[in-house]
């Protein structure tokens, strides 16, 4: 079957409700520095992933930490293809009509994780609004396959919102729940129309709360990117909403514009302010908070989960 058409950059954002005025990316402040890739390890890991026909969000979303994570032989695996059914203008993953789920992907994923001897993995996906359960059943199949091959490996999932199919999705995840459930709110509710067309703030909170109700012993986690025009008070209000919905773990990081056709960065939050947010999060009762310019939801996820469990 031929590869489907992938829209990125201007082709992706041209049909969303707001108009993106192309802007050159701002000069980065001195505190934002990604580590240069360790080329032998990066090439080796990419080779393993391509041979297994797997994708990583590290590559598809142009994550600034790719060099560091690949250099350590770790990655966040992206299942269900590399085409998203939505057009979020902050994200660098391509938009298009995806292929049906690959029935061999759970096996390929499990074999690759076993080959790499990973102790902690993050599994994420694009939005799959074309599937009746939003892809949750495929998540469960992947979790079960990994556990069969690597029973000691801990598994975190970073899910889409399963909007319009939440009950089906949660029922599917009941078959093979993860060790950590992560779903990112991404930004404050005032900015949802601009940053997350097709998503709903209250629905995302409900997903996290409903999963927690069904699996009270499994930690829940969420994250936001800062720099899209939100205020500090709005961030604190979202943090309070997350705690009110039983979320245990928090990540806050700096939004970086993938290209001139994506949403512009409106401010760079200082490391000192991130440190204050982290202290405020812990005071609210989060079991763990990772807040910093280069923090991403799956960055050092194993360390976050271990710290939360110890706390």
Swiss-Prot record:
Pfam families: LIAS_N, Radical_SAM
GO cellular component, as recorded: cytoplasm
Compartments, record wording: Cytoplasm
Protein name: Lipoyl synthase
EC number: 2.8.1.8
Positions that bind [4Fe-4S] cluster 1: 58, 63, 69, 298
Gene3D superfamilies: Aldolase class I
PROSITE patterns linked: RADICAL_SAM
Reaction catalysis annotation: [[Fe-S] cluster scaffold protein carrying a second [4Fe-4S](2+) cluster] + N(6)-octanoyl-L-lysyl-[protein] + 2 oxidized [2Fe-2S]-[ferredoxin] + 2 S-adenosyl-L-methionine + 4 H(+) = [[Fe-S] cluster scaffold protein] + N(6)-[(R)-dihydrolipoyl]-L-lysyl-[protein] + 4 Fe(3+) + 2 hydrogen sulfide + 2 5'-deoxyadenosine + 2 L-methionine + 2 reduced [2Fe-2S]-[ferredoxin]
Obligatory cofactor(s): [4Fe-4S] cluster
InterPro entries on file: Aldolase_TIM, Elp3/MiaA/NifB-like_rSAM, LIAS_N, Lipoyl_synth, rSAM
Entry keywords, A to Z: 4Fe-4S, Cytoplasm, Iron, Iron-sulfur, Metal-binding, S-adenosyl-L-methionine, Transferase
Family: Belongs to the radical SAM superfamily. Lipoyl synthase family.
HAMAP family noted in UniProt: Lipoyl_synth
A GO term, aspect molecular function: lipoate synthase activity
Pathway: Protein modification; protein lipoylation via endogenous pathway; protein N(6)-(lipoyl)lysine from octanoyl-[acyl-carrier-protein]: step 2/2
Keyword Transferase part of the UniProt annotation: yes
Cofactor binding summary note: Binds 2 [4Fe-4S] clusters per subunit. One cluster is coordinated with 3 cysteines and an exchangeable S-adenosyl-L-methionine.
PANTHER family (UniProt xref): LIPOYL SYNTHASE (PTHR10949), LIPOYL SYNTHASE, MITOCHONDRIAL (PTHR10949:SF0)
Domain Radical SAM core: 70-287
